[in-house]
Amino acid sequence: MSKPVDIEDSDEAAREAVRIVREGGADILMKGIINTDNLLHAILDKEKGLLPKGKILTHLAVMEIPTYHKLLFFSDAAVIPRPTLQQRIEMIWYAICTCRHFGIEQPRVALIHCTEKVSAKFPHSLDYVNIVELAEAGEFGNVIIDGPLDVRTACEQASGDIKGIVSPINGQADVLIFPNIESGNAFYKSVSLFANADMAGLLQGPICPVVLPSRSDSGLSKYYSIAMACLQVAGCECREKLNLNR
């Protein structure tokens, strides 16, 4: 068993935890009672941090919702306020890789908007068009991506049928990519509160999985997040390909 490390200063504790990971002494990093800013500062340190050059830091969560027929992944509810096109592409790659760790060979990724219409008034809907074109050209491999779609159409077949929307995602989404942090975070908290959903989440991008629980997360949610991190470590070949070959 490893010897406990007792450090009172939050910044120093975060730096030491990051150092241990960098030197191979740990496979997973988890935030405890220190502030998120303290940990992120250590993770993002350009010289001694955990984020490889050129990678983005984002958040991916997964929920088991009693009224949905399978696990539902979504991003980003915690880190990137308004993703750029390239950031959205990276978010999708992280989600695809994580889905594979969960045994989902052909993830269905829905690009979420308040409507199914593309409009220059909503620049992210134009990004969605580009992403769908990349997916159709095989850029993401064995994955189905469509959008813009609203949450209901992405997760309920009847909604798409009523609207007359023809999409390979209708009612079958594995992943929801939200347009901004406001919509993602509102979804995250609404579903966990009103639908009694079990949840797990990790930071994506660093060289190891990072469990970043919210202050209001339950013990069970933290447990599930650790389990999700263990799956990601076990699927390190996919993670290494994601970080090093792209």
Language-model-detected regions and their locations in the chain:
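Anion-binding alpha/beta catalytic cores of soluble intermediary-metabolism enzymes, centered on
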Residues: 1-169, 174-246
